[in-house]
Amino acid sequence: MLTVTNLSHQYGTNAAISFGNFSLDAGHALLLRGGSGAGKSTLLHLLCGVLPVQAASGTVVLAGQSLQTLTRSERDGLRPYAVGWMPQRQFLMTSLTVLENVLLPASLAGRADDAACKRATALLHSFAIADLAHLRPQTLSVGQAARASLARALMTQPKLLLADEPTAALDAVSSGLVIEQIARYVQGGGAAIIASHDPAIHPLWDSVSNSDATLDEIELPK
């Protein structure tokens, strides 16, 4: 599914951030640990195509495709069907309803048909926010917005889910729902990478997943 080899990234003249080597198969998840500045968000940006994999900075192969060979438009095309992206800041569009936000990936691809609408509604039910479907995102709590953001990332059933600090500032109930839905996605054959410093992630995962959905942990070098 995903193979990362000797990957690094450099911002301007700053020292390069090194991510080393790792791989991820379908039906598995990785938990990225590391302090502030370790590059957790940068790594996710590289994997989802927001940042380019620079020449001589290693390789990333996703579902048999080398990301460093892709143009900007081709990288943008990874989202949302190859990669589902849940950024640290939720970035829900305030001009759309919650349902329209969840449906947005399908709408942008011209695939907002009846089946897509039914899937979006089903996702809202699974995240316990179906009653908020026709509200604007600015009326949501932090936890509700996080659930809507994850539902949007899962809307197109991507091969790989990237979640940046998905439980940040959430209460226990919302954190549990978010991790449970990520675990279900992995149990269904997806692959996920979670970047987080939340010590509750692993215990939450163990409480909601079965032995078939493993959560391995890697520490990014300082």
Where on the chain are the PLM-derived regions?
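Conserved ABC ATPase "signature" region
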Residues: 66, 103, 115-132
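Conserved ABC ATPase signature
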Residues: 136-140, 144
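Conserved catalytic motifs of ABC-family nucleotide-binding domains
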Residues: 157
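Conserved ABC transporter NBD signature motif
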Residues: 56-66
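ABC ATPase NBD coupling module
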Residues: 67-84
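Catalytic Walker B motif of ABC-type/P-loop ATPase nucleotide-binding domains
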Residues: 161-164
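Short coil-to-helix segment of the ABC ATPase nucleotide-binding domain corresponding to the Q-loop/switch region
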Residues: 96-104
